[in-house]
A protein has these predicted regions:
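Short, Lys/Arg-rich flexible segments
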Residues: 2-181
Length: 181
C-alpha cells in the first residue's frame, strides 16, 4: 500500500492548533497568578465572610466557643458572663446566611468581629505564585492567631469553588479564545 499524504491545509491547521496549545500552556500560569493579584480584595472578603459565618479556612467552626472561652473564666460567674456576651453579640452582629453558602453561625460560635478592626486588618499580599493572607496593623491580631490558629486566614473550599466558577474559568475561556483554540 502506498502512503497517503495529508493535504497541506490540514497540516497547517494542525500546526496552528499545536501552536495555540503551546501559547496557552506558556501563558496560563502567569495569567492566573496575575488574576489572583488583581483580585486580592476578593480573597480578603472570602476570609472575612468565612469568619463572619463562624468558620475557619477548613470550614470548621471557630473554637473555643464562647461558653468554652478561657477569657470568661476570669469572671466571677463565667457562664453568666459568656451568656451575656453571646446575647450582646447576637444583637450587634446577628448571624446571616453567607453568599458562599455557609449557614448562619449559632449563638455560641465566635465570628471575631466587634468593631471591625480585625476584619479591616486582613490583608492579601501578592507573592510570586499567589497570595499570602495576614493581619496587618492591629495590635491584638497575634492574640487572635494564638487562640484560633493561622487557619483563620486560609481560603476554604466554598470560597475556592466560588472563585473558580466566577473568576478563574471565565479567564481560562478567554485565554483559550485568545490562543485560537
Amino acid at each position: 500500500m502506498g502512503r497517503i499524504e495529508a493535504p497541506l491545509f490540514l497540516y497547517m491547521e494542525f500546526k496552528q492548533y499545536c501552536e495555540g496549545w503551546k501559547k496557552l500552556a506558556k501563558g496560563m500560569e502567569k495569567s492566573l497568578v496575575s488574576q489572583l493579584h488583581d483580585n486580592k480584595e476578593l480573597f480578603e472578603e472570602f476570609v472575612t465572610e468565612q469568619l463572619y459565618s463562624g468558620v475557619n479556612g477548613r470550614e470548621e467552626a471557630l473554637r473555643p466557643r464562647y461558653s468554652e472561652d478561657p477569657y470568661f473564666q476570669g469572671f466571677r460567674d463565667p457562664k453568666k458572663a459568656s451568656d451575656a456576651y453571646k446575647k450582646w453579640k447576637m444583637r450587634i452582629q446577628p448571624p446571616a446566611r453567607s453568599y458562599l453558602g455557609f449557614q448562619p453561625r449559632d449563638a455560641d460560635t465566635p465570628n471575631l468581629i466587634i468593631r471591625g478592626d480585625f476584619y479591616a486588618s486582613i490583608t492579601a499580599i501578592p507573592i510570586a505564585d499567589g497570595l499570602m493572607i495576614v493581619s496587618q496593623g492591629v495590635s491584638f491580631s497575634a492574640d487572635i492567631e494564638r487562640k484560633y490558629g493561622n487557619v483563620i486566614y486560609e481560603i476554604g473550599n466554598k470560597a475556592r469553588e466560588h472563585y473558580v466558577r466566577h473568576y478563574m474559568l471565565p479567564r481560562i475561556d478567554k485565554l483559550i479564545k485568545e490562543c485560537g483554540l
